[in-house]
Amino acid sequence: MPELPEVETVRRGLETLVLGQEIVAVTLKVPKMVKTDLETFALTLPGQIIQSVGRRGKYLLIDLGQLVLVSHLRMEGKYLLFPDEVPDNKHFHVFFELKNGSTLVYQDVRKFGTFDLIAKSQLSAFFAKRKLGPEPKKETFKLKTFEAALLSSQKPIKPHLLDQTLVAGLGNIYVDEVLWAAKVHPETASSRLNKAEIKRLHDETIRILALGIEKGGSTVRTYRNALGADGTMQDYLQVYGQTGKPCPRCGQAIVKLKVGGRGTHICPKCQKKRL
């Protein structure tokens, strides 16, 4: 699943490709992807001009002025821009024809991606309803708020970080990286974390997601950015996908286990499980 660094990289690519373009026609082949009114989606988008492309957590925000098209890539969604003819592909599901003759295509092998067309004035309420946490930046991701939320919960720390309420944008790859960097076992109850561990989790979340953005995201399975290029963050992953390899910190073999139903990579020496 594209996580915050991948979505931010897609955002930057889209802004380069389609900023200022007018949508002249929309073709939707998988109606279930649109979570707001289908007729409004089909009739309102033509004539709209893409004024900016933003992001909130893992959501892309295509700013159309008074309206915002909120796009979530889910597991394998991606955008491609074709300057003229669009090739046949059974995984192309949404087609945005632009005034300059190009077509922005949404591709999704698993058809899990979603679109919500909402008034810009409703954007805050949209994310509040989903209890989306702050962006992972020093200015918005406050240590004391993070600490209070952790200490009041019995949830294991990995599922807690994944649920998007503590901080927006973490997925399976980057949670494993953050937990390893902070020397925290993924099954540790949130309330049992000490202040030093909480600070490390906070600081490493900011650092690692920023690094992921800098490296253009992780191409682990099928991720490509909007320009069709791979990311390079996979070359900097310390534990995710490194089963059997030596821990970069202590040399112990990385192991893979299941936490909350998710494949999880840890160093059993650096990330000791509490009894």
Curated annotation (Swiss-Prot):
> What is this enzyme's catalytic activity, as reactions?
Hydrolysis of DNA containing ring-opened 7-methylguanine residues, releasing 2,6-diamino-4-hydroxy-5-(N-methyl)formamidopyrimidine; 2'-deoxyribonucleotide-(2'-deoxyribose 5'-phosphate)-2'-deoxyribonucleotide-DNA = a 3'-end 2'-deoxyribonucleotide-(2,3-dehydro-2,3-deoxyribose 5'-phosphate)-DNA + a 5'-end 5'-phospho-2'-deoxyribonucleoside-DNA + H(+)
**Enzyme Commission code:** 3.2.2.23, 4.2.99.18
Please share the entry's free-text remark on the cofactor. Answer: Binds 1 zinc ion per subunit.
Q: Where are the zinc fingers (FPG-type)?
A: 238-272
- A GO term for molecular function: damaged DNA binding
Q: Which SUPFAM superfamilies match?
A: Glucocorticoid receptor-like (DNA-binding domain), N-terminal domain of MutM-like DNA repair proteins, S13-like H2TH domain
Q: Which GO terms describe its biological process?
A: base-excision repair
Q: CDD domains from the xrefs?
A: EcFpg-like_N
- Cofactor(s) needed: Zn(2+)
Assembly and partners? Monomer.
Any idea what job this protein has?
Involved in base excision repair of DNA damaged by oxidation or by mutagenic agents. Acts as a DNA glycosylase that recognizes and removes damaged bases. Has a preference for oxidized purines, such as 7,8-dihydro-8-oxoguanine (8-oxoG). Has AP (apurinic/apyrimidinic) lyase activity and introduces nicks in the DNA strand. Cleaves the DNA backbone by beta-delta elimination to generate a single-strand break at the site of the removed base with both 3'- and 5'-phosphates.
Protein name in the entry:
Formamidopyrimidine-DNA glycosylase
> Could you tell me which species this protein originates from?
Streptococcus pyogenes serotype M1
Tell me the name of the encoding gene: mutM
